[in-house]
Amino acid sequence: ANPVKQMLERLQEGLSDRFKIEIRSSSDEGDYFELYGGGRKVTVHANNYVSAAFGINWYLKYYCHAHVSFCGDQLPQLPVDLPQVKERHATKLSDNFYMNYCTFSYTTAFWNWKRWEREIDLMALSGINMPMAMVGVEAVWRNTLLKFGYTLPEVKEFLCGPAYFGWLLMGNLENIGGPLPDEWFKEQIVLQKKILARMREYGMKPVFQGFFGMVPSSLKEKYPEARLVEQVPLYNVFTRSNPDSLYQK
């Protein structure tokens, strides 16, 4: 199924019938979209689904005076005869990044699938192809720490609540705003799988969290032989030494 067609139907019933979408590779290896025609239907040529969605949003904005945005939509019924168009836009910039760690505290902490579906559609319409995908990282922490000898209550004591996930992701906070209920982990795993599936349908490249060395302060009780470095209260100073062998595990 064409995710752009499905997205257009979510915006407005029948909107997908007004666009013919053809995905074609680009000879110059850049992202591009081309708009042709008018009347009953506009033809969109693009190198991928995100470029096609961005091109359609361009047409809606500059030819139909419609507005689809993160702040709301003004999308009237399109005229029977669509305005004529012949345009091509291209870029050599291949990675369009979106979101930051704090987004997952301030904004998305309690989003459900319906809200995420809307956000991913808006990403595509905005030409975004490299969004952060941090939903459910706390479940990864849970599973990892359980493998390293933690009990579930101990894991929950380390993790923070949803409103503080940004700081957990950045590695400068633990044990604030929790504990998380058991159902939370299950729900977030299901939600993240839906998010990733939709992003990949569009051809997006989701960005995941890597391990950068932060561990619970209680890890020294589990692994007393490991060389752990406490976070000192200094600003903008690098204090870390070479990591212990436990880091590799």
Per-segment meaning from a language model:
Residues 1-93:
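Contiguous, structured surface segment used for ligand recognition
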Residues 24-26, 38-45, 49, 74-75, ...:
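Aromatic-lined carbohydrate-binding surfaces of glycoside hydrolases
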